[in-house]
Amino acid sequence: MKRTTLLLLAVAALFCVSCNNRPKYSEELQQTAPALCKGAEKKLVCMDLDATLTQHKTPLSDSARQALDKLGERYALLMVGGGGAERIHKQMLDYPIDVLGNYGMEEARVVDGEWKIVRKEVCPVDTASVLAKCQALREKYGYTEYYGKSVEIHASGMLTFGLLGTEAPKEEKLAFDPDKAKRRAMYKEVCEDFSDYSVFIGGSTSFDMTPKQYNKYDAIMRFAEENGYSRDEIIFIGDDLDDGGNDSHVRLGGMDYIRVYDYRDFPKLVEPLLQ
C-alpha cells in the first residue's frame, strides 16, 4: 500500500479510538484525513505553539517535546507563532527548532547547532492614532478598566491590544474569554478601525495586529520558497483556524492542516504522521 493510503487509515483509526471525550475530532476527520493524503508527500511540518503544543504561555511539556523529537526524525519542523521568536524559544525551553515569530516579521534558524535570529523586520507605528483608536473601542465596549498599559506596541511595529491590559493576572486572562465570543463581538469593528493591519483574535484576551503583509500563511510560504518546499509538501498543525483566528490565513490559503482542540492531544494527533 502507498504511504499516503496507510496514513489515511492511521488517521481514521486514531480519530475513532482517541476521541471519546472530544467528539469534534471525528467531525473534523472528513476534512483533515483527505487533506493529509492529497498532493505531494509531506516534508515540512509547521505548527503553532499556544493552545497547540502548550497552554497559553506555559513551558513545553515532556510529552510534547518527545512528540517533536519523533517528528523531527522524519520531517523538517517549523514553529510559526504570533509572539516574538525569542519568547517562543524561551517558552519551548530552548528546543532546537526553526521559528517564524511575530507572524513572519522575525525568523530564527538552528545553524550548526546554534539557535539564532537571522531576520528582524520593523514597521513604523503612529502611536497617537493607535492609542486613540484603542481607547475609543474600550469606551464603546466597556473595557475601560485594565491592568498595565492599554496596548502593547512592539519594537517590530506589531500591536497587541489586550482587553484586560498588558499586566493582567494569568488566571484572570485564561478565564476571561475562553470561547473568544467577547472578542468576536467586536472583531469586525477592530478590523475596520485598523484597516492597515491584519487583525487576529490572539492569545486569551487580545487582538494581535500586524502590518497588512504579515500573516502565518504568507510567512510559511516565504520560508518554503526560500528553502525549496512546495505548498503540497507542507502540513500545518494549529488550533485557531476559524475566521479571525491567528491561524486562519493557513486555512483560507488552502494549506493542508490538522486542527487541535486541546493541546494535551498533540502527541496523539501527530501519530498518523509517524506511520
Listing of model-derived features with the role each one plays in the protein:
Residues 44-46, 98, 235:
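Hydrophobic "anchor" residues on beta-strands that sit immediately upstream
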Residues 58-148:
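Active-site phosphate-binding/coordination module
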Residues 36, 40, 60, 212, ...:
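Mg2+-dependent phosphoryl-transfer enzymes with acidic/Ser/Thr/Gly-rich catalytic loops
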Residues 103, 111, 203, 261-264:
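Residues at the C-termini of beta-strands that transition into short coil/loop
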Residues 145-235, 243-246:
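Conserved acidic, metal-coordinating active-site core of Asp-based
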